[in-house]
Each structure stands twice: as C-alpha cells, then as structure tokens.
A protein has these predicted regions:
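Conserved catalytic alpha/beta cores of large enzymes that bind or transform nucleotide phosphates
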Residues: 138
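Phosphodiester-processing cores and adjacent nucleic acid-binding clamps
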Residues: 1-80, 86-89, 96-103, 107, ...
Length: 307
C-alpha cells in the first residue's frame, strides 16, 4: 500500500471503525507496524494475508473411468462476452466429437448473448454484435450442444473456464450437467515439461498443428481436438491404455507449474496467527516459485483459528 499503516489505522479510528484488517500480499511485513500503531487505541487489528494458493493434491484427471480412449470425447471451446460466469454470456460454441480415436462429427453455433459484446472482446474474437444478433438464444444453443455432447467426456483447454460457463448456463436454463472433464492444459504440463507456457497457440505451434483464427471457438475446438489426439498417442507410448491410467502413470500435477489463485486468509485468534505465520514461512522457505506458493493441503492442516 502507498499509505503507511500508522496513517491507515489513525484514519480508521477517525472514521469510527472498531477494527481494521491488514492483508499483506504473501508476506507479514506490515504486522509489526500495525501492532505498534494500534497499541493503546480503541481499535482491533485483524491480521491476514492475501496468499498465492495452489492445489498441491490435484489429479490430472478428476474421477476417471476405466474405459479406453475409443470412448466418446467432445472437445469444445466457447467464446464469451467476458470472464464472469454469472455476469457474462456465451457468444459461440464450437465442438468436435471423437470416437474410436477419430473425428466423427462437428458442432458450431453462435449464441445471442442478449448484451453488447465489449469492443476489446470483439477485437480479440472477431465476433461482432451484428454476427450474433440473429443467433439462437442460450436456451436453444445450449440444448443442441448438450444433445451433441451426450454420453461424452468433455475436453477443453483450460477446461475450468469453459466447463464452468457451460455448467452455470445449464443450471440457469434448467438443463442437466453431469459430464466429467479432461483439461489439455494439465495434460500438456506433464507430457511437454520443457515448455514454459501452455497457451493453445503455443502448444499448437510446438506440435505443428494448424491453428488459424485463434480465439474463435470453432477453430480453437478443432486445434484442441488435434492436440488431444496427439496426446493420446504420446500417453499410449508411456503405457497408458485407460483413462484411469493417466493419474497412475503420471502422478500428481507439479503444483509449482500451476497458476496460483488469490486467497484472503485472516487470523481469528492467537492460534490462527501462529498458523498464519507457519503457512507463510512454508510458502517462502519451501515452495517459492516466482511467488511464495501456499499449499492447499497445508492450509487444511492449519485450518483452526483461520477464516
């Protein structure tokens, strides 16, 4: 912060606040100043941290079945008006059906988002308001996509984003969503460990796969399908025959290669403050990779006294 802790606390007192929370970013450097500035004054300091949280117990594939790679996979991509699953809407869905290790069918539709597409998103995706004006609404487009994806495992690059949108919109329009998912981004991290960045365009280039019209769902889905087929061949060479073999052969994801999430954690009492110090010390001493990475498993162990 550009504001000194002393001035911050004095201003909080001036405004009549009874408590103020201090959340340093990954560190506790402001804690001593906060303690000294609040000593003898009618205000409580709540000590906390904005942590770089990583899931160090993450399987590559969640809840894998025992079937081989000849089963149905629907590799898909979406374009949206923004990043919020609740505040933004889908503008395009593109998908490729894989079965018996081959491309069997394709699906593509624009979606009327019932809102203006921000200018910067139009520049990125080349999808304009005019292009979606007469497109089917989400209720119609999503039903067609879910029919296309029936009895299939969904595959996407950075799958949490795409499946998060699909699941939320299914809930919104009253459609069932019970699909398992595979993330080609996580697969890339174990199958192509020499790469430092795993964007779809970089991955396609590294594998000599054509990706024209990047950030259009139909094109990204096609490229992701080709990447996934290539990954299947690579995994088979490593002895992976069934979906459930992936976690057995490759183990857990290296959490230092995951993008951390920001989590705000507060100490509720003295025990919580001690646990907070232990978590922060561990992140700096044992798991520093570009940032002090706080492990989710350790947070669970030190959960008492924290909110």
């Amino acid at each position: 912060s550009v504001v000194s802790v002393k001035n911050l606390i004095n201003k909080a007192i001036e405004w009549g606040h009874k408590a103020v929370a201090i959340t340093d970013h990954g560190v506790v450097q402001a804690f001593p100043d906060a303690m000294n500035a609040s000593k003898g004054k009618d205000i409580k300091v709540i000590y906390g941290v904005e942590a770089y949280l990583v899931d160090d117990d993450l399987d590559i594939v969640q809840n894998p079945n025992e079937r081989d790679f000849n089963q149905r996979f629907v590799v898909f991509d979406i374009e949206t008006t923004g990043f919020s699953v609740t505040g933004d809407n889908i503008t395009e869905i593109g998908a490729v059906l894989l079965e018996d290790g081959q491309i069997k069918d394709r699906f593509s539709t624009f979606v009327n988002p019932r809102m203006d597409i921000p200018y910067e998103v139009q520049e990125l995706t080349n999808i304009t308001n005019d292009m979606v004006e007469d497109a089917p609404p989400i209720e119609e487009a999503l039903k067609k996509f879910m029919d296309f994806a029936r009895d299939s495992i969904l595959v996407a690059h950075n799958a949490d984003f795409d499946t998060g949108f699909i699941a939320q919109k299914c809930s919104q329009v009253g459609l069932d969503y019970k699909h398992e998912k595979i993330d080609t981004l996580l697969l890339a991290r174990v199958l192509m460990p020499d790469m430092k960045r795993f964007g779809l365009d970089r991955l396609a280039k590294a594998l000599a796969i054509n990706l024209s019209g990047h950030h259009r769902a139909v094109n990204d889905a096609e490229a992701t399908a080709q990447i996934f087929l290539r990954f299947i061949s690579m995994m088979k060479k490593d002895g992976v025959e069934k979906l459930s073999d992936i976690n057995k052969v490759y183990g857990k994801i290296d959490h230092t290669k995951l993008r951390p999430s920001h989590a705000t954690i507060y100490a509720q009492n003295y025990l919580g403050l001690r646990h907070l110090y232990e978590l922060i010390s561990d992140s700096h001493l044992n798991h520093f990779y570009r940032q002090p990475l706080m492990r989710k498993s350790l947070v669970k162990q030190k959960r008492e006294g924290l909110i």
